[in-house]
Amino acid sequence: MAKFDLTAKNCQYLDRHLTFPLLEFLLQKDIYDQTSLLKFILQTVSKTNMVDYTMDIRERLNMGDELPEELSKRRANVLVKLKELQTEVAPLMKCMEELKNPDSMKDSKSIVHALQQEFDFKHDIIKSAQKLAKYLYECGNYRDSISYLYICLLVMEPADKNYLTVLWGKLAAEILVLNWPTALEDLTRLRDFIDNHNFSPIEVLQQRTWLIHWSVLVFFNHAKGRDLIIEMFLYKPLYLNAIQTMCPHILRYLATAVIINRGRRNALKDLIKIIQQESYTYRDPITEFLEHLYVNFDFEGARMKLHECQTVIVNDFFIIGCLQEFIENARLMIFETFCRIHQCITIGMLADKLNMEPDEAECWIVNLIRNARLDAKIDSKLGHVVMGTQPLSPYQQLVEKIDSLSVRSEALTVLVERKQKAKTQESGEGNWKYY
């Protein structure tokens, strides 16, 4: 399924360290030639100080398990440089340890003032701390890097030219150690900085595009992420504009979030509108599934796309963890839409629409009824599912009636248009024969 693989597109907007998990994931999928992929990883890792990882890739490429002289010298140089930077930064670490309650101080100026008053603090040492954090990060020592980046953010002013770089570094490191609560805090902090800083239009568009890609990693691993990704990507115009302008492929992840989030079904109409607008620049089985189901009311097309969606998700690093939820919710969406048009359905017909065996479909409906997520009865003798009606207020009845009529009208309109189009094509073919 290389056709729908987004790894190359996504990696353009990720720090090279963030690409390593994606590339290792691809190695397990046999989508691309293993040797070519390993060579690309080796080329990428050679730009870091991760000597051990470099050796691991060399071994997998059968390049020998002995440490080449070049790498041996590089490792020695890395250790020397690391020791130098740690010595330079040691006074700052000691000061921060002895400083009482730095977190409770209002801003960086207060902390720096306290450090200058009590410890004869020199501002240049912050640059050394930033260099050390970056060096540790390049060595793959992300946890220690976070400690220094945290201190840098405590003592640096937002106006500092390196402040934005430190924010990005902190977010990357938190993602790489899988610390999702703090990563979300850093993501919010970085987004606020980008939105309120005086960037040029091109710069701010680039920053938002990078942030969108990094945030996908956070949102699909955080408990609140499924709501937050919808709020940020669909309902923040500046970020929606960035997606439409720079990276419409991100609609895959927005669509996935809406599908697996039952509490956000109200976002479907807005999402589908965007998917239709961008269909000329990007489409995949996930976006097409929604189009088939909610625009064309093509249940057969939706069923076929759902099958393709499973293959896409299995091969996508960002959303593979959502596979079962996606299938369950997509089936439920097909079922709900189908039931709004038909009140009585045969289990066989339903099984066909849901890509299930009849027994499996019946069991699935029984579980829905048992869990109070569906008001329906099963007539096992006739093999029918009869939709129930719950008592509603007059207002709710009116809304439901209008909604149901709207869905049926749209479905009929699409059906009539489809038949008319078929007749026109047949007519055109007939006329052509006379020439």
Curated annotation (Swiss-Prot):
Subcellular location: Cytoplasm
UniProt entry keywords in alphabetical sequence: Cytoplasm, Initiation factor, Protein biosynthesis
MF (Gene Ontology): translation initiation factor activity
GO cellular component terms attached to this protein's record: eukaryotic 43S preinitiation complex; eukaryotic 48S preinitiation complex; eukaryotic translation initiation factor 3 complex, eIF3e
GO biological process, one term: formation of cytoplasmic translation initiation complex
InterPro entries assigned: eIF3e, eIF3e_N, PCI_dom, WH_DNA-bd_sf
Domain of life: Eukaryota
One Pfam match: PCI
Domain PCI: 219-392
SUPFAM superfamilies on file: Winged helix' DNA-binding domain (SSF46785)
Protein family: Belongs to the eIF-3 subunit E family.
Subunit structure, as described in the record: Component of the eukaryotic translation initiation factor 3 (eIF-3) complex.
Function text: Component of the eukaryotic translation initiation factor 3 (eIF-3) complex, which is involved in protein synthesis of a specialized repertoire of mRNAs and, together with other initiation factors, stimulates binding of mRNA and methionyl-tRNAi to the 40S ribosome. The eIF-3 complex specifically targets and initiates translation of a subset of mRNAs involved in cell proliferation.
Name under which the protein is recorded: Eukaryotic translation initiation factor 3 subunit E
Organism: Aedes aegypti (Yellowfever mosquito)
Gene: eIF3-S6
